[in-house]
Amino acid sequence: MPRVSAPLVLLPAWLLMVACSPHSLRIAAILDDPMECSRGERLSITLAKNRINRAPERLGKAKVEVDIFELLRDSEYETAETMCQILPKGVVAVLGPSSSPASSSIISNICGEKEVPHFKVAPEEFVRFQLQRFTTLNLHPSNTDISVAVAGILNFFNCTTACLICAKAECLLNLEKLLRQFLISKDTLSVRMLDDTRDPTPLLKEIRDDKTATIIIHANASMSHTILLKAAELGMVSAYYTYIFTNLEFSLQRMDSLVDDRVNILGFSIFNQSHAFFQEFSQSLNQSWQENCDHVPFTGPALSSALLFDAVYAVVTAVQELNRSQEIGVKPLSCGSAQIWQHGTSLMNYLRMVELEGLTGHIEFNSKGQRSNYALKILQFTRNGFQQIGQWHVAEGLSMDSRLYASNISDSLFNTTLVVTTILENPYLMLKGNHQEMEGNDRYEGFCVDMLKELAEILRFNYKIRLVGDGVYGVPEANGTWTGMVGELIARKADLAVAGLTITAEREKVIDFSKPFMTLGISILYRVHMGRRPGYFSFLDPFSPGVWLFMLLAYLAVSCVLFLVARLTPYEWYSPHPCAQGRCNLLVNQYSLGNSLWFPVGGFMQQGSTIAPRALSTRCVSGVWWAFTLIIISSYTANLAAFLTVQRMEVPIESVDDLADQTAIEYGTIHGGSSMTFFQNSRYQTYQRMWNYMYSKQPSVFVKSTEEGIARVLNSNYAFLLESTMNEYYRQRNCNLTQIGGLLDTKGYGIGMPVGSVFRDEFDLAILQLQENNRLEILKRKWWEGGKCPKEEDHRAKGLGMENIGGIFVVLICGLIVAIFMAMLEFLWTLRHSEASEVSVCQEMVTELRNIILCQDNIHPRRRRSGGLPPQPPVLEERRPRGTATLSNGKLCGAGEPDQLAQRLAQEAALVARGCTHIRVCPECRRFQGLRARPSPARSEESLEWDKTTNSSEPE
């Protein structure tokens, strides 16, 4: 059968002439709220009738008549009596009532018996058990469709827990689809029924205590508004609660009394504001209310009035189409007879085929007489009024405009003051030095304060910082409640928790977190255990005292062996006068006891000496000693760098396993913090063992704050388990603290918000923006760096101080003092055994000191023993020598006259030796060769004998 579509104003005159009266088409309307200052149902019927009758296309004088009957009570008797008054008038349809379910059921039964169409304009009651009459049509959307639409919204917002407030017990049957979805998905839906007092306050308090954030209100417009006002009084109208109204008159609610415009209130609307007559219809209602009422009861047309308006048009359209196929007539009926209207069934068939656009949108019915193929607009309350953010269609389902919804949330943050709960914790939040002179947010400083300023600048909101009452981050109690900042968020006492609040799975179940603004992990903080402080003789530290002792013994042993070997081997005995090889009976050994002690010293100091080993045995001793000193010096040099450039720490533990395997060092964490929860819930064997130790240790190893933990580390044998960021901060400011090992886990700090916070996505985007702009890293460097302790890499480049190598200067000074003292002893000893002099010892010493200061008198007579003769230069015999002579410095003295050569040689008094007759200078005895010297009278006979021996063998 083809669908029927007809304009509402094209009503031919012949259609109007088929009624029982040749001049009218009669429709009956039953109103249960006939007051002028109510929903405006009477006015809407009048407007529909007049608009149809004023249509210029209408021919003749026939017109539509609507008889209005008032129903004072929802009574079966009065309803039946009213119907008995309507049937004799010969009506083609009965409309209403709008708010009397019992009366509506009686009317449907009577109309069904007489086969007169009946239009309902109220939601069905007892949908599952009531038999829908064929003659009954319902313009009001079914509760089943509304239930499916609510379920779609809950799915869109990922709501896993919700509370359904019912004004009547029948709502459990009406919203069966919604209940079934929660049963299938295993989500939580609590149902609360209003009591007979109709006071929702106790019910709302229970919902608040249950921490339920999504509330579905299934009640009429008046009761829904009352519930919302009571919720506002309890502080439940905020950004952390979501209200969903199933009443289709949501757009008529007055929200002016709501203080917090951040509340997320959603509802449905079926009004078609694009309809050509909608504005005129609304203006007429408002004008009527203003003229006849003390106040305007609604902000727009009530749903029942719009449905009655559309019902009149639907009946007229169906009658028009029916009359095209057959002539219809209407005759009076009676309650006392079994007579029916013969055209009633045909008209019902045409009514089910009607399609038109009315004030409530598209009008179409299914085979059951229920409205179909329509759409519900989803509205959200904003500071600018109600805004459509999506729609639900019977066939297409839910479609939401996420951009509009997000923009409403962003706009709701504008110029909004958020309560921020936090805790004093360096460097996240600290009191300024002069905080007594300030008030409000100006009293605080720190990383979180700066980050809040950045976020407020991006999202354009205001904030008020408030310290948490109990001074803890938040842990669950045995009764299921939470303490600290987490507890305040759950109780909706704060909008944000901005601090070093760790994101954990347990906390995520009860509050929402933003994206992490800082990544960290648990670390071990322990005090620095330094070895003995560096002293002046710390250059001896590379070797232990035992090594130094064995080195001394090795030195003495080598000296003794060298002295012994040099005495035994014949190759270390040689003639002191190589010029007289084979003619001198004297042999000399250079390894005296003093030289044997000096030679190893020169090798050990890598300076060498003038003593060179001749024999293989002495060279073997020398080589072994040099190899020994090479290894010793190399080892000393390598170890000296480690000992003097880096202060070595003596740490008894190096990892978390070392800490868990011992009991001498106590360890613990902050009570009620995320680190404590980490160890408590960990399944790793080492961490479980650590938790058992911390939990059972008495006195308790847990601390209340980070400052208390730091003090305990410094003043006792205690290791503190805390976040790596705090570890880094305090190590920068106390050089006696160090981190042991690496991180025990990886986690992040986030901004806490109550469950269901509509600002979560906005803060996520703002945090990502700060990270991309590197603002968070800049803030961290600002508050973490600048400590008095240098970075660890700076220790390697630190110069050595006097406390490290001052001892070597002490050794040098002592050696110089000993050398001066020995020189004075030698000076005095020489003077005492020299020839008698008229000059005193003091004068001699003064003279030498003066020469030293003036750098003069490098040559002076040799001091001889008492009774000895003073040395005199040798007298050279004048004879013609060879043309040249080689001096001791390796230079050639020119040929010239013999006298000149002799005079030149005589000037080299220090190089002229006794008994030498050669002009060449001997490299061993440094004597001249080639000239014969006359012995002076003071020369002994032994010297003269030596001259004779040497001269007799020399060629002339």
UniProtKB/Swiss-Prot annotation:
UniProt xrefs under CDD domains: PBP2_iGluR_kainate_KA1
Glycosylation sites noted in the Swiss-Prot or TrEMBL record: N158, N220, N272, N286, N323, N408, N415, N479, N736
Extracellular-facing ranges: 21-545, 645-804
Any one of the GO CC terms: hippocampal mossy fiber to CA3 synapse
Chief subcellular location: membrane
A GO term for molecular function: signaling receptor activity
Bias kind Basic and acidic residues: ranges: 939-948
Taxonomy, superkingdom: Eukaryota
Keyword terms: Cell membrane, Cell projection, Glycoprotein, Ion channel, Ion transport, Ligand-gated ion channel, Membrane, Postsynaptic cell membrane, Receptor, Signal, Synapse, Transmembrane, Transmembrane helix, Transport
Binding annotation for L-glutamate: G500, T502, R507, S674, S675, E723
Region span, Disordered: 931-956
Signal peptide start-end: 1-20
Protein topology in the membrane: Multi-pass membrane protein
Cytoplasmic topological segments: 567-623, 826-956
Transmembrane segments: 546-566, 624-644, 805-825
Tissue occurrence: Expressed in the hippocampus and cerebellum (at protein level).
Pfam families linked to this entry: ANF_receptor, Lig_chan, Lig_chan-Glu_bd
InterPro entries recorded: ANF_lig-bd_rcpt, Glu/Gly-bd, Iono_Glu_rcpt_met, Ionotropic_Glu_rcpt, Iontro_rcpt_C, Peripla_BP_I
Record has Ligase as a keyword: no
PANTHER family: IONOTROPIC GLUTAMATE RECEPTOR (PTHR18966)
Subunit structure: Homodimer. Can form functional heteromeric receptors with GRIK1, GRIK2 and GRIK3 subunits. Forms a heteromeric complex with GRIK2.
Assigned protein family: Belongs to the glutamate-gated ion channel (TC 1.A.10.1) family. GRIK4 subfamily.
Primary role: Ionotropic glutamate receptor that functions as a cation-permeable ligand-gated ion channel. Cannot form functional channels on its own and produces channel activity only in heteromeric assembly with GRIK1, GRIK2 and GRIK3 subunits.
Protein's name in the database: Glutamate receptor ionotropic, kainate 4
